[in-house]
Amino acid sequence: MDVRDSITDAVRSVLADLGVDPLPTTVQLERPGNPDHGDWSTNVALASAKAAGRNPRELGTQLAECLLAAPPAHVVGVEVAGPGFVNFHLADSWLHEVLADVVAAGVDGWARHDDGVGTRVIVEFGSANPTGPLHAGHGR
């Protein structure tokens, strides 16, 4: 299972255990701009707090505590930052596992797929005005 899927599933499970209703339809995971903020970050506590009638920071803290008690695969640290962002730190074992998968798949097997094979595509270049903002009308 992908580490992102593992984290997402764990977050949704903990939110359900905490009684957050309605559960978010998606859990957005992003790579933080600052490496000190972990390997992955989510704003799910901020997004869910209003509907749950809770303070985002407190919800994030509860989420982090529950996730630390039973961490998802490869997660070694969970912390709350700012108004309720939840940051995840991954173990080096995650990178080792991914690299082992890449080596095992070989040159011809890793990140290759047949999507779009045999399909013709037309590539157009828009004539955008360099002095103004780019918008949908430039694609005509």
Task: List each language-model region with its residue ranges.
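Amphipathic alpha-helical segments within well-ordered protein domains
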Residues: 12, 45-46, 64
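Conserved alpha/beta enzyme-core scaffolds, especially Rossmann-like or related mixed alpha/beta domains
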Residues: 23-31, 79-82, 117, 121-127
